[in-house]
């Protein structure tokens, strides 16, 4: 298997063609960004941490019957994944009030929701990734109604598994962002990554943060927070 040409470079990853048909080579970057790229810094070791954590979580979800694009970890900073067409929606699941929800609605951070809330955001940097309703999604024509229902169902299943996974190691899953893609056959797969870049993760007892808010809000050392998550998960799960 050979790493091919660069197809796409985003804020946190580079995507390369693979010599195997239907597969792509993902390379994580040490770059940390926030506020739609307005804040940016290179943090040594971040690529390895995100790759390790995301690989571990995708492998764990696969064992629970939740399909994703993940095939295997290739190196400290690389993964092999199935090629999918990414749906331009971020699916956000919230268990506790935090971040933009607290700011948007004027609710104090840390309040547990009576039930998980699923939100959709339209992936468009120029528009600032706006919050959209299911009616907006229909107008944008980026996903059929039955696909939206499936996205919500899959997001709920991921939430249930991640809550249990993190609770086992004393971590509270506050909220997280998912992305999905379609295979050539039309199957919906979980895609992108699941890491402290895409999840808010607090210590269950102390409420210490182990996620990108460390960088976003200047709350502490990002690499130390991510390493804490990897160390806790690594004690119980192995790819």
UniProtKB/Swiss-Prot annotation:
The enzyme's E.C. designation: 6.3.2.6
Pathway: Purine metabolism; IMP biosynthesis via de novo pathway; 5-amino-1-(5-phospho-D-ribosyl)imidazole-4-carboxamide from 5-amino-1-(5-phospho-D-ribosyl)imidazole-4-carboxylate: step 1/2
Alphabetical list of PROSITE patterns matching this protein: SAICAR_SYNTHETASE_1, SAICAR_SYNTHETASE_2
EC supergroup of this enzyme: ligase
Swiss-Prot/TrEMBL GO biological process terms: 'de novo' IMP biosynthetic process; cobalamin biosynthetic process
Pfam families the UniProt entry points to: SAICAR_synt (PF01259)
Alphabetical keyword list: ATP-binding, Ligase, Nucleotide-binding, Purine biosynthesis
InterPro entries: SAICAR_synt/ADE2_N (IPR028923), SAICAR_synt_PurC (IPR033934), SAICAR_synth (IPR001636), SAICAR_synthetase (IPR050089), SAICAR_synthetase_CS (IPR018236)
Matching PANTHER family: MULTIFUNCTIONAL PROTEIN ADE2, SI:DKEY-6E2.2
Annotated family: Belongs to the SAICAR synthetase family.
Protein name: Phosphoribosylaminoimidazole-succinocarboxamide synthase
UniProt gene name: purC
């Amino acid at each position: 298997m050979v790493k091919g040409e660069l197809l796409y470079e985003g804020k946190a990853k580079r995507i390369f063609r693979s010599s195997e048909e239907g597969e792509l080579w993902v390379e994580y970057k040490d770059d940390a960004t926030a506020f739609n790229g307005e804040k940016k810094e290179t943090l040594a070791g971040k690529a390895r941490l995100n790759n390790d954590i995301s690989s571990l979580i995708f492998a764990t979800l696969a064992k629970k019957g939740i399909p994703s694009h993940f095939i295997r970890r290739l190196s400290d900073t690389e993964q092999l994944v199935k090629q999918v067409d990414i749906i331009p929606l971020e699916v956000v699941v919230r268990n506790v009030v935090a971040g933009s929800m607290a700011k948007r609605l004027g609710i104090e951070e840390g309040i547990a929701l009576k039930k998980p809330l699923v939100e959709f955001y339209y992936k468009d940097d120029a528009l600032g990734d706006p919050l959209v309703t299911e009616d907006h999604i229909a107008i944008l024509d980026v996903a059929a109604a039955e696909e939206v229902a499936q996205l919500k169902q899959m997001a709920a299943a991921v939430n249930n598994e991640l809550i249990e996974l993190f609770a086992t190691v004393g971590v509270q899953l506050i909220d997280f962002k998912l992305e999905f893609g379609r295979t050539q056959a039309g199957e919906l797969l979980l895609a992108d990554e699941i890491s402290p870049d895409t999840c808010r993760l607090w210590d269950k007892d102390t409420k210490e943060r182990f996620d990108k808010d460390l960088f976003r809000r200047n709350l502490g050392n990002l690499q130390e927070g991510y390493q804490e998550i990897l160390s806790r998960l690594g004690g119980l799960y192995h790819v």
